Amino acid sequence: MKYERTFKTIVAVGVIGTLLATVSSMTWADDNAEAKPLALRKIMQDLGKNMQVITDGISREDWELVAKIAPLVADHPQPPLGEKMRILSFVGTDAGKFKGYDEKTHQAAQALGQAATRQDGPAVISAFAKLQNSCLACHQGFRKPFLEHFYDKR
């Protein structure tokens, strides 16, 4: 009877230890998964490249190029749903502000493309300024906290 109780205790401790080890290794794996770049990072890098192409097009008055690239900025890809939920959860009460910047960027890039299609240089410059301002405002409000939270960069 005494040995049976000791055996059950040893088995119970072994099972609990195994479960704890499994859970802690899963948590560690999740922490590493969070350190992987978000899809948002690739989206932002592509947006940056497209903005450089637009800047080049404007400087050369290549309105066809600007009109071609502006929709890539206006209708940029969205992060996968799970990532989007993580991002919105992180921004919390600023989610409306974050979405607002995205909408302003969308509208300004659409206006930029339309102005370029009309070959209206002053309207292109005005729309591009609005686009740059919406990008800058979002970056100033969210870039540093994102890097700290999602990439542990301080």
Show the residue positions of the predicted features.
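Alpha-helical transmembrane segments
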Residues: 17-21
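Sequence context surrounding c-type heme c attachment/ligation sites in exported
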Residues: 30-60, 64-154
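Bacterial N-terminal signal peptides that target proteins for export
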Residues: 2-15
